[in-house]
UniProtKB/Swiss-Prot annotation:
UniProt keyword terms in alphabetical order: Amino-acid biosynthesis, Cytoplasm, Diaminopimelate biosynthesis, Lysine biosynthesis, NAD, NADP, Oxidoreductase
Residues annotated as catalytic: H151 (proton donor/acceptor), K155 (proton donor)
Similarity field: Belongs to the DapB family.
Pfam families for the chain: DapB_C, DapB_N
Protein's name according to its UniProt entry: 4-hydroxy-tetrahydrodipicolinate reductase
Binding site for (S)-2,3,4,5-tetrahydrodipicolinate: H152, G161, T162
Species this protein is from: Dictyoglomus thermophilum (strain ATCC 35947 / DSM 3960 / H-6-12)
Gene from which this protein is expressed: dapB
UniProt GO cellular component terms: cytosol
Keyword Protease attached: no
Cited function: Catalyzes the conversion of 4-hydroxy-tetrahydrodipicolinate (HTPA) to tetrahydrodipicolinate.
PANTHER family: 4-HYDROXY-TETRAHYDRODIPICOLINATE REDUCTASE 1, CHLOROPLASTIC-RELATED (PTHR20836:SF0), DIHYDRODIPICOLINATE REDUCTASE (PTHR20836)
Length: 268
């Protein structure tokens, strides 16, 4: 059994992931951490009778040993959580977004220094990861590309981590093949109307109630367009990816960014 603890256990994502960890036959949830729900019964919060667990306020209150920590909190809390876990020499799976490059570089160093492993993934939906992998093949033939990402109106950051990762991967692929994206726009009548830009790739963010998490990658060519789109219809779509990450990270050492790091394990 892989003994696991969960930071942000009582948040919207945390409740979904917590239930999945409890239901998994090879994973044991030994700690639910969420300072806003400290002292409450976790089984009542997520609606299950398969476990009896009191919500803890911090990692310092944990008495059980564990193998992997999972974090779905916010960037500020995750930064502290990740440092503590890596310094303990434990492995970590992180779904929290908004982490800066400076933070990520620090995590890389800590993972190596403490002979442990960490995966940070902007998106755990397998469909979203495959969308990016497909787009990586398409951009070689259609270098004129833009990204539209759409999320619920409670999402705090824009653009999404998935959109940024997509643009980074596509931009790297374009550079590898000496390709460029042409944009003739010289004047924005409304500032920002062409979206944000990562290298030559424009990213457009939409925030509306009723949305969950969606992304469309649009490629344009002579007389044609090609779109690749992923729609997350509920938070349950992230469960298979999170479980895969936990099962894989236990075998690894070092730093990994993006769930595709583990999808390609057979080629590694």
């Amino acid at each position: 059994m892989i003994k696991t603890i969960l930071f942000g256990a009582c948040g919207k994502m945390g409740r979904v992931i917590g239930k999945a960890l409890i239901d998994a036959v090879d994973i044991e949830l030994v700690g639910a951490i969420d300072p806003y729900f400290k002292g409450e019964k976790y089984e009542k919060i997520i609606g299950t009778d398969k476990i009896s667990l009191e919500v803890l306020g911090s990692i310092e209150e944990l008495k059980e040993d564990f193998d992997v920590a999972v974090d779905f909190t916010n960037a500020e809390a995750a930064y502290q959580n990740i440092k503590k876990i890596l310094q303990m020499g434990k492995r970590m799976v992180v779904g929290t977004t908004g982490l800066t490059q400076e933070m990520i570089n620090e995590f890389k160093d800590l993972a190596v220094k403490n002979n442990t492993a960490i995966l940070i993934a902007p998106n755990f939906a397998l469909g979203a990861v495959l969308m990016i992998q497909l787009a990586k093949q398409v951009v070689k033939y259609f270098p004129d590309v833009e990204i539209i990402e759409l999320h619920h109106n409670e999402k705090a950051d824009a653009p999404s981590g998935t959109a940024i990762l997509t643009a980074e991967i596509l931009s790297e692929e374009m550079k590898k093949h000496n390709l460029t994206h042409k944009d003739a726009t010289k004047v924005e009548k409304l500032p920002g109307s062409r979206g944000g830009k990562l290298d030559s790739i424009n990213i457009h963010s939409v925030r509306l109630p009723g949305l969950v998490a969606h992304q469309e990658i649009i490629f344009g060519g002579l007389g044609q367009t090609l779109s690749i789109r992923h729609d997350a219809l509920s938070r349950e779509c992230y469960i298979p990816g999170v479980l895969m990450a936990i099962r894989e990270i236990i075998k690894r050492e070092g730093f990994f960014y993006g769930l595709e790091s583990f999808l390609n394990r057979e080629e590694a």
